């Protein structure tokens, strides 16, 4: 890296006003992005008359999962 770049970064990190301003700018951008994401998510919420996903035709069979989820009995301590 060039020494000019490193000197600029060092000056930035040592100046609390610059760091604070950059942090505030980033926070403002993140807040705007989060607001936009919330608006898009609100638009995508399914309406009762038009659901996003079709209901399943049959309930899923989870019997094979139950056998794997049972834990072995604890070992006896001597």
Swiss-Prot record:
Biased composition range(s): Basic and acidic residues: 39-50
GO CC annotation, single: host cell nucleus
Subcellular location, record wording: Host cytoplasm; Host nucleus
UniProtKB keywords: Early protein, Host cytoplasm, Host nucleus, Host-virus interaction, Inhibition of host adaptive immune response by virus, Inhibition of host TAP by virus, Viral immunoevasion
The keyword Cytoplasm belongs to this UniProt entry's keyword annotation: no
Stretches for region Active domain: 3-36
Transmembrane segments: none
Residue ranges of the region described as Disordered: 39-78
Pfam families linked: Herpes_US12
Keyword Kinase: no
BP term (GO), one: symbiont-mediated suppression of host antigen processing and presentation
Role description: Plays a role in the inhibition of host immune response. Binds specifically to transporters associated with antigen processing (TAP), thereby blocking peptide-binding and translocation by TAP as well as subsequent loading of peptides onto MHC class I molecules. Empty MHC I molecules are retained in the endoplasmic reticulum and ultimately directed to proteasomal degradation. In consequence, infected cells are masked for immune recognition by cytotoxic T-lymphocytes.
Subunit structure of this chain's protein: Interacts with host TAP1 and TAP2; these interactions inhibit the loading of peptides onto MHC class I molecules.
Family that this chain belongs to: Belongs to the herpesviridae US12 family.
Domain free text: The N-terminal active domain blocks peptide binding to and peptide transport by TAP.
Protein name from the UniProt record: ICP47 protein
Organism the protein comes from: Herpes simplex virus type 2 (strain SA8) (Simian agent 8)
Gene coding for it: US12
């Amino acid at each position: 890296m060039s020494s000019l770049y490193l000197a600029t970064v060092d000056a930035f990190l040592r100046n609390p006003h610059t760091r604070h301003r950059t942090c505030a700018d980033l926070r403002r951008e993140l807040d705007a992005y989060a607001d936009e994401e919330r608006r898009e998510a609100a638009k995508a919420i399914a309406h009762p008359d038009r659901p996003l996903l079709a209901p399943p035709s049959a309930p899923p069979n989870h019997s094979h999962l139950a056998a794997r989820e049972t834990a072995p009995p604890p070992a006896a301590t001597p």
